Swiss-Prot record:
HAMAP family: Ribosomal_uL13 (MF_01366). The keyword Ribosomal protein applies. This is Large ribosomal subunit protein uL13. Keywords: Ribonucleoprotein, Ribosomal protein. NCBIfam families: rplM_bact (TIGR01066). It comes from Synechococcus sp. (strain JA-3-3Ab) (Cyanobacteria bacterium Yellowstone A-Prime). This protein is one of the early assembly proteins of the 50S ribosomal subunit, although it is not seen to bind rRNA by itself. It is important during the early stages of 50S assembly. GO terms for molecular function: mRNA binding; structural constituent of ribosome. SUPFAM superfamilies: Ribosomal protein L13. It holds the Pfam family Ribosomal_L13.
Length: 151
């Protein structure tokens, strides 16, 4: 019987990546970020280990959606009390908390387990172009989510 080699935990050193969300499609951006957080881009990916990297997303306020999703996509939350349902459109949530839009999209693409919650903590999202993680020397990760666009 063949067994898949499991990398030792001390060899799993995470890297830091910087992703610019300006003029990127929300869903396609979230797919790439989720893959980086899980570590699926690495040759030593192991599903039950945290092999992922840290991802810094800047310019969250400039992420776009296509079609009528700007006014028709709804975000719901509930306070737990009777009648406590709050509903916001994409445009309202992006104006109020632009980071939350990307966080919710990426969180839905990660495993809904303890490991997924741990990987989600490696996501850092900022509304503007500045972030406090210069000391980690993040590498710019080029991302192109517009199909057919010339790069």
């Amino acid at each position: 019987m063949n067994t898949t080699p499991v990398p030792p935990p001390e060899t799993l050193t995470p890297r830091w990546y910087l992703v610019d969300a300006a003029n990127q499609r929300l869903g396609r951006l979230a797919v790439v970020v989720a893959k980086l957080l899980r570590g699926k881009h690495k040759p030593n990916f192991t599903p039950h280990l945290d092999t992922g990297d840290y991802v810094i997303v800047i310019n969250a306020e400039k992420v776009v959606v296509t079609g009528k999703k700007r006014t028709q996509k709804l975000y719901r939350r509930h306070s737990g009390r009777p009648g406590g349902m709050k509903v916001e459109t994409f445009a309202q949530l992006q104006a109020r908390l632009p980071e939350r839009v990307i966080e919710k999209a990426v969180k839905g693409m990660l495993p809904h387990t303890r490991l997924g919650r741990r990987q989600f903590t490696k996501l850092k999202v900022y509304a503007g172009p500045h972030h406090p993680h210069e000391a980690q020397q993040p590498q710019v990760y080029p991302i192109h989510t517009i199909p057919g666009a010339k790069v």
